Design a protein with these regions (language model features):
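Thrombospondin type-1
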Residues: 1-83, 211-231
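Residue-level detector of functional hotspots within protein domains
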Residues: 34-36, 91, 185
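Acidic, Ser/Thr/Pro-rich low-complexity intrinsically disordered segments
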Residues: 94-212, 223
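Predominantly extracellular/luminal regions of secreted and cell-surface proteins
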Residues: 83-93
């Protein structure tokens, strides 16, 4: 509440008019510092303040991280791709909530494979290839923290991931990454696409075999009466 104040005579100091006590008014509630939960970080419901007097009226609560929910091997929450297949083109995107996108791949045979990306929208992307033993969600969580710090302060370090096996930022199409690597049969690898700085966007990725190791089958020899087959 409040008080209107007394009216005082400047000459004699007498109270000319008594003030009135005011009843407290209703707070104008505003919720601040809301944070959405994702597959990698917890959320926050936000603190409630009075937008008029700026008093905090209520504390918010932490909300748990989301679970990866897969449908056709794609997480419905974050877009993460599990069990990526050879010669299949996947379209995905990064956002401010999910600045890094994960593609899991298990090599069907020993051999050389290429992870080739194309930026569909105009942004500068980075690609990282991880061996299974060096990758977990904490890698992405650390990257998100760097990304958010860079968004808040342009002078902060670029949001580079740690622990990767190989990385690239230019050998795909439209400033997208492409990485070629010798992989082991039945080993799992993780290819991660993320921002060079703070720009996010849409991209496609295709994993192919480079056919560096070949052999010939079905060869037959020709003579004067019958043809042959090169195999």
């Amino acid at each position: 509440g409040g008080y209107t104040g007394d009216v005082i005579c400047d000459t004699c100091g007498k109270v000319v008019e008594q003030g009135q006590t005011l009843e407290p008014g209703e707070h104008q509630e505003a919720v601040l510092d809301v944070k959405d939960a994702t597959c990698y970080v917890t959320g926050y419901t936000g603190d409630t303040y009075c937008s008029f007097c700026n008093i905090k009226l209520a504390e918010g609560t932490v909300t748990p991280k989301l679970e990866h929910e897969y449908e056709d091997n794609v997480c419905k929450n974050c877009g993460r791709i599990n069990n990526a297949q050879l010669d299949t083109t996947y379209t995905s995107k990064t956002t401010n909530l999910y600045p890094f996108q994960v593609i899991q791949f298990k090599a069907p045979e020993n051999g050389t494979y290429k992870f080739y990306c194309e930026n569909i929208t105009n942004w500068d992307s980075y690609g990282y290839l991880f061996k299974e033993e060096n990758f977990n969600d904490q890698v992405i969580i650390d990257g998100i923290e760097k990304f958010n710090a860079k968004k808040a302060d342009s002078g902060a370090e670029i949001p580079t991931l740690s622990g990767y096996w190989q990385c690239d930022d230019e050998h795909g199409k439209n400033s997208a990454p492409a990485i070629t690597a010798e992989l082991e049969k039945d080993k799992t690898y993780y290819f991660v696409v993320g921002p060079y700085s703070t720009a996010t966007g849409e991209f496609s990725i295709t994993i192919t075999c480079t056919h560096e190791k070949t052999h010939r089958e079905g060869r037959t020899l020709s003579d004067c009466t019958e043809g042959g087959y090169t195999g």
